[in-house]
Design a protein with these regions (language model features):
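Surface-exposed, flexible coil segments in extracellular/virion-facing regions
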Residues: 378-392, 496-509, 607-608
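Active-site recognition of the HExxH zinc-binding catalytic motif
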Residues: 217-233
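Extended beta-solenoid/beta-helix repeat architectures
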Residues: 687-844
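Low-complexity, disordered linker/stalk regions enriched in Pro/Thr/Ser/Gly
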Residues: 344-360, 364, 413-490, 497, ...
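Secretory targeting and sorting signals
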Residues: 1-18
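Conserved aromatic beta-strand anchor motif in extracellular beta-sandwich/beta-rich domains
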Residues: 370-376, 492-494, 594-596
Length: 844
């Protein structure tokens, strides 16, 4: 498709209101580069727009000099979209276009985080504005401004409105190029606005931030609304406070309920087929049960959702099985069309020696089942190997014979198991794997006539996109011309070696078990009637992407595992998703993901509102604009801030801070769709804080060291003798070695991190803190009569008081603990004790 130019209205770079109308004549449109001009850039064309869902991504608030920034923002947005199922597998069911639009100024109206404050006078080509206006610091809905003053305050009577501008660009540019109506049901727009601030809104005219770390996730969430017809699952209408309880009636949303699992199963309604499954998004799929997931649909209580998390509740997670089942049906059925695309030989009578065909849209990672029958839908199955074309010449069928074909996407329980509803319907909430969104049939009658000979033709019509590499397990496909009297031939070569196709039009690369590296795949397409063969050539990316991690410095590593760090309260993780760029144009954007304690994969976007920041995990999370991120506590990483105050009896309560040991997995997904192998590490977070040093000792220390007052810190020190700590004094030992014994009587605090003590350790009567992490203690250890100050009241209230903290140490001698304020605790990182362990330490 050619790239067109000179589209849009003319407003002037600094104009506060538009002086033009949305019906401006095409010959008055400005040249590309002028304010309000536009151009359409195809990003992905997989088929006729009438047979696809078409996404048009529109740039707003980007000046002429910032168009490259919009292109980069859209690339990131789309690469994240293609990493999430079902978009990853059904990418070829979607066309994507970028509409570049030149704004007179940078950014949009009423951005609460704009430097210098929100600007009420800024006007962009699409009139986007943060709603409800410039006075709300938590504004996150970004809407097309209305001329009547709603949605940001255009002067009454000002024209055109944001919606008119939106329609203008579609009518004057997009619709003519795509050949579909500007209001077509299979046309989805997404306005990407130039801001680092989190925000967006749903509908068939969705919006999202271009620069926000979560911008691509906002648009996925909004597609859940507009494409998937899904409701919000979060527990509030206004962020700072819980939503009202749900009324005493069953919600209309297909993914909310007030029924118990038993009631749902008995009535065979909602998501009863998924009950009890481990959710893709965290937790176990439940209903309104004691262990169910209460709150959702902007209600704080008395309504239940299927899973602990999902992208419809907290951005970053994937759809759970219930949501994915509906999203895939909406994708394959072209939103409201309700039909899987299947161009074919026109139904009716066909020549007895002719060729009949169907053109299937190809999922990226699995084959469709194509079954040919003689005698109608219940007739004899022909052994065609899933061929898309059938030559009748060799079948010798009698005139009047009925020929039937079924194309089926095997999404049901016997295949992918993505759709468990067996219905034959295709409605929004009842689209089954036996329905027309996943199954299409065609039928012909064999006639008396023979097929006329046709001249040679260009054999290739389309195929898997060649402008980017294929994934190592992708199904490559070719779409050919369809002469009436013969079948176009397709031959495959991988790295110069002939390989057999999976069907007459496809090759499943996953069946070849490719070696690592970049390969070359060539399809040679030949018309038997003559003419030159045509070829399609792809790079095949068989290099798995990686996401190397960098963690903030720990107190120490567990003695038995150098990759298992221990931190007070929190730690940071930076991922650097990386892939081999061979075969790509430039350095591709690679998606990173991580998973906490097996609780659903989560998109790595850094940290909210902080450009290029690491992700912070902490015992109770960090609050950003009334939302919690990175919580290690009960209920998962993402929550509303008010949920952190919940106690027993509240939905999901009580909230318990996440001190203890956690497992974090992380991986990368490259633009080809390869999912790298996950790496993992354990991390232990303990309550407390490092002592602040009054005196620091490092290097060699000859003889015994006595700590008589204040806080003495040994940092990288080697003490040739023993160490003693007097009453009221404190000691912190970091990465040091003590050749003799360590004794403390009546000290305020004793902390050892990653250190070695060759002699015995005796700590008695400490008044505030005993914390020993990742250390090697070669003699006997005795902890007696110590008081451990509780660093987190909520944790101690719900999990019980803890005594001295002993985490991941290696103790060669005996370990004896008695008379402490509470039993010592290892917070999930056991100690290796060679000798006997007695008293309160018997379980360590």
């Amino acid at each position: 498709m050619a790239v067109a130019t000179a589209l849009a209205t003319a407003t002037g770079a600094a104009a506060a209101t538009s002086t033009t109308t949305a019906q401006q004549a095409a010959d008055d449109l400005p040249e590309w580069g002028e304010v309000d001009s536009a151009r359409l850039v195809p990003l992905q064309e997989t088929g006729d727009p009438s047979e696809r869902l078409n996404i048009v991504v529109m740039c707003d608030g980007y000046t002429a000099a910032e168009q490259d920034a919009c292109a980069a923002d859209v690339e990131r947005n789309q690469n994240v979209q293609w990493s999430v199922e079902p978009f990853r597998s059904y990418r070829h069911y979607v066309n994507v276009y970028r509409l570049d639009i030149v704004s007179g100024g940078s950014g949009i109206r009423c951005d609460p985080d704009e430097e210098g404050g929100p600007d009420p006078d800024k006007v962009t080509p699409l009139r986007l504005v943060f709603s409800p206006g410039c006075d709300d610091p938590l504004a996150r809905g970004v809407v097309y401004n209305n001329a009547n003053g709603q949605g940001g305050g255009d002067d009454a009577g000002a024209t055109p409105t944001g919606r008119q501008q939106h329609d203008f660009y579609l009518e004057n540019y997009v619709a003519p190029e795509l050949g579909i109506d500007a209001g077509a049901q299979n046309l989805q727009t997404l306005a990407v606005f130039n801001s680092f601030t989190y925000g967006g809104i749903g509908g068939t005219q969705a919006t999202t931030s271009g620069g926000s770390p979560q911008g691509p996730l906002v648009s996925l969430h909004e597609l859940g609304h507009s494409l998937g017809q899904m409701a919000d699952e979060y527990p509030y209408s206004l962020r700072p406070t819980p939503g009202d309880p749900h009324p005493d009636r069953e919600p209309g949303s297909f993914h909310h309920t007030r029924m118990t699992s038993q009631q749902m199963t008995d009535s065979q309604s909602k998501w009863f087929r998924w009950l009890g499954e481990e959710s893709l998004s965290g937790g176990t799929i439940r209903a309104a049960d004691p262990d169910g997931h209460e709150s959702g649909a902007t209600r704080g209580s008395d309504v239940w959702r299927p899973s602990e998390h999902s992208i419809m509740r907290w951005l970053g997670f994937h759809w759970d099985q219930v949501g994915r089942e509906h999203m895939v049906a909406r994708l394959t059925g072209q939103r409201n069309a309700g039909q899987m695309s299947l161009p074919s030989t026109p139904e009716g009578e066909v020549p007895r020696d002719g060729v009949v065909w169907v053109d299937t849209t190809q999922p990226r990672f699995h084959e469709l089942d194509v079954t040919w029958r003689v005698g109608g839908p219940d007739g004899r199955v022909l052994d065609t190997g899933g061929a898309r074309s059938l030559d009748l010449a060799g079948l010798d069928l009698e005139p009047g014979t009925v020929l039937h074909v079924e194309a089926r996407d095997p999404v049901g329980p016997d295949g992918l198991d993505w759709v468990r509803n067996p219905s034959t319907n295709n409605t929004t909430t009842d689209s089954g794997y036996n329905g027309p969104r996943f199954v299409q049939t065609r039928q012909w009658t064999v006639g008396e006539a023979t097929a006329p000979a046709t001249p040679p033709t260009d054999p290739v019509v389309a195929g898997s996109p060649t402008d980017r590499p294929l994934a190592a397990d992708e199904v490559a496909s070719v779409q050919t011309a369809h002469p009436a009297d013969r079948v176009i031939e397709v031959a495959w070569e991988l790295d110069g070696r002939a390989v057999d196709g999976t069907t007459d039009r496809t090759l499943d690369l996953g069946s070849l078990d490719l070696a690592g590296g970049t390969h070359e795949l060539v399809a040679t397409v030949t018309d038997p009637a003559g003419g030159d063969p045509q070829t399609l050539t792809w790079a095949v990316d068989a290099v798995p992407p990686t996401a190397p991690r960098t963690l903030s410095p720990s107190l120490a590593s567990v003695a038995s595992d150098p990759d298992h760090g221990v931190w007070f309260d929190e730690f940071d993780m930076t991922l650097e998703p990386t892939d081999d760029p061979t075969g790509y144009d430039g350095d591709p954007y690679v998606v990173g993901e991580f998973r906490l304690d097996g609780d659903g994969w989560f998109n790595y976007f850094g940290f909210p509102e902080q450009e290029d920041a690491p992700f912070t995990f902490s015992h109770s999370g960090k609050v950003v604009k009334s939302l919690v991120y990175g919580s290690l506590g009960s209920g998962g990483m993402s929550k509303a801030a008010f949920e952190q105050e919940y106690d027993a009896g509240d939905p999901g309560g009580p909230f318990v801070p996440g001190f203890g040991t956690h497992t974090v997995e992380h991986r990368a997904i490259d633009p080809a769709g390869n999912v790298g192998e996950a790496d993992a590490f354990d991390a232990t977070v303990i309550p407390g804080a490092e002592l602040e040093c009054d005196r620091t000792v490092s290097g060699a220390v000859a003889g015994r060291l006595a700590v008589r007052s204040g806080t003495t810190c040994l940092d990288g020190a080697t003490v040739r003798g023993g160490v003693s700590v007097a009453a009221g004094a404190s000691l912190k030992v970091v990465g040091s070695t003590v050749s003799g014994s360590l004794s403390a009587t009546g000290a305020e605090a004793v902390q050892l991190f990653g250190s070695t003590v060759a002699g015995s350790v005796s700590v008695t009567g400490t008044t505030a803190d005993v914390t020993v992490v990742g250390s090697t203690l070669r003699g006997s250890v005795a902890l007696t009569g110590n008081t451990q100050r509780q660093a987190n009241e909520r944790y101690s209230t719900h999990e019980g008081a803890y005594g001295p903290v002993l985490v991941g140490n290696r103790i060669s001698g005996s370990l004896a603990c008695s008379g402490n304020s509470a039993a010592p605790r290892d917070f999930g990182a056991p100690n290796e004790v060679t000798g006997s362990a007695s008293g309160g330490c018997a379980g360590l």
